[in-house]
Design a protein with these regions (language model features):
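Surface-exposed beta-strand-to-loop junctions
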Residues: 18-25, 121-125, 160-162
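Mid-core helix/loop region of P-loop NTP-binding domains shared across ATPases and GTPases
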Residues: 6, 60-159
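Conserved P-loop NTPase "ATPase switch" module shared by AAA+ and STAND
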Residues: 28, 149-172
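Signature of the SF2 helicase/ATPase Hel1-core->accessory helical subdomain module
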Residues: 1, 131-134, 146, 166-167, ...
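Flexible loop/turn segments at secondary-structure boundaries
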Residues: 33-36, 119-120, 166-170
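P-loop NTPase motor core
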Residues: 1-100
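Short, well-ordered alpha-helical packing segments
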Residues: 44, 48-51, 142, 146-150, ...
Length: 174
C-alpha cells in the first residue's frame, strides 16, 4: 500500500490534535490481573479497574465503584461524600484507606452516603459490597463507557492501552 497525504490533510489533523483532549490508560494486563478473578472475565475486570480509576472511582474494588461511588457521582454528591469522609478522618482518594473503611466502617460509610443521597438503598448496597456482587458484563462496561464519553464532546478520546496481552493469553491457555 502506498500512503499519500496532502498538506491540507496533515494540517487538518494537526489542528484537531491542538484542540483535542486525549486521556490514556496504560497498563500491563499480566501484572494488573487479579488471580482470584474468573479467567474468562479477566480482560473485562482489568479494563473496568482502569476505567473506574479514570472516572475517579476506586479502581481496585469494582463493587464499591459500581454500587456506591457511581450512584453518588450520578447524584452529584460524590465530592461532598469524599469531604464528609475526610471530616471523619478518612481519605477516600487513597484506595487502600477507602478499602479499609469499607472493611471496618461500612455502616459509617453508608450513613454518610445516605445523608447526602437519601434515596440510596443502604441495605442493598451493603449486601452487594459484602457479597462482592459486581454484576459485570461487556454490555454494562460498554454502557458505562458510552455514558462517560457522551458528555466529553467530539474532540475527546480515551485510549486504553493494554500491554502483555499475548503473554497473558498464552500463559492462561497452558
Amino acid at each position: 500500500h502506498s500512503l499519500q497525504f496532502d498538506f491540507r490533510e496533515i494540517e487538518s489533523i494537526a489542528n484537531w490534535l491542538r484542540r483535542a483532549t486525549i486521556d490514556t490508560c496504560i497498563f500491563n494486563l499480566e501484572t494488573s490481573y487479579d488471580n482470584s478473578t474468573d479467567k474468562k472475565k479477566a480482560f473485562l475486570h482489568v479494563f473496568f479497574f482502569f476505567f473506574n480509576g479514570k472516572r475517579g472511582f476506586n479502581k481496585f474494588n469494582i463493587t464499591m465503584a459500581q454500587h456506591l461511588e457511581k450512584p453518588l457521582a450520578d447524584k452529584g454528591v460524590f465530592e461532598a461524600f469524599k469531604k464528609r469522609i475526610a471530616e471523619e478522618g478518612g481519605d477516600w482518594n487513597d484506595p487502600g484507606m477507602a478499602a479499609d473503611m469499607i472493611d471496618n466502617e461500612l455502616s459509617l460509610v453508608l450513613d454518610i452516603a445516605a445523608e447526602l443521597a437519601p434515596s440510596l438503598d443502604k441495605e442493598s448496597i451493603r449486601e452487594r459490597i459484602i457479597k462482592r456482587d459486581t454484576n459485570m458484563s461487556i454490555e454494562r462496561f460498554g454502557g458505562e463507557l458510552a455514558a462517560y464519553l457522551k458528555d466529553k464532546g467530539d474532540d475527546y478520546r480515551l485510549i486504553l492501552l493494554a500491554d502483555e496481552v499475548s503473554q497473558f493469553i498464552n500463559k492462561e491457555r497452558d
